[in-house]
A protein has these predicted regions:
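Short glycine-/polar-rich loops that comprise or flank the Walker A/P-loop
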Residues: 21-23, 136-140, 155, 172
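Short helix/loop capping segments that flank catalytic or ligand/cofactor-binding pockets
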Residues: 35-36, 133-134, 169
Length: 172
């Protein structure tokens, strides 16, 4: 559903505000790097194999207002699926964690997400990007696991929510 809501934001910005935006989703876990690598692979497979039946099932079962409004906006479901497959293709997704080989190169992408030429729409991260990182077009944060609650994790979660729970940062 996060991908569909992200697409809804993109479509509304285009239709209502006449602006091209690139909403970014952060998929975050505190578990091991192998777990995030597998989640990334599963996500890519899900996007590549996305079908009309799957989208229709989400549209029919969802009670989220954004999904219901998106359903009304989608005129051609095949074009909509093509847009998702293009927007979230393999080279538009980034995996980052402490053990990644090309971490410095990936950090350059992360620090230029607002650049229209930067293709990244989804980030898969393991216990990284916790402090001092702010991106105007990061609208959705998907927590992929439940960790034990500590005072530090509660503060970290509040900071994370603060990054994702923002108003549309552009004038309209």
């Amino acid at each position: 559903q996060a991908v569909l809501i992200s697409e809804y934001r993109r479509i509304v910005a285009s239709d209502v505000l006449n602006r091209v935006i690139k909403p970014v989703i952060l998929f975050k876990t505190v578990k091991n790097t192998e777990n995030i690598d597998n989640l990334y692979k599963d996500f890519i497979k899900l996007i590549e194999n996305l079908s009309v039946n799957e989208i229709n099932e989400i549209f029919e079962k969802s009670t989220l207002e954004a999904i219901l409004k998106l359903k009304e906006k989608v005129e051609d479901i095949n074009s909509f699926i093509s847009a998702i497959k293009y927007g979230f293709r393999k080279d538009s997704c980034l995996v980052i964690h402490s053990k990644i080989k090309d971490k410095e190169e990936k950090l350059k992408y992360l620090n230029s997400l607002e650049n229209p030429k930067n293709p990244i729409r989804a980030i898969f991260a393991v216990d990284i990007l916790n402090e001092g990182w702010d991106v105007l077009n990061l609208f959705d944060i998907v927590k992929l696991d439940e960790a034990k609650k500590t005072a530090n994790s509660t503060i970290s979660e509040a900071q994370l929510i603060g990054r994702g729970a923002r108003y549309f940062p552009f004038e309209y």
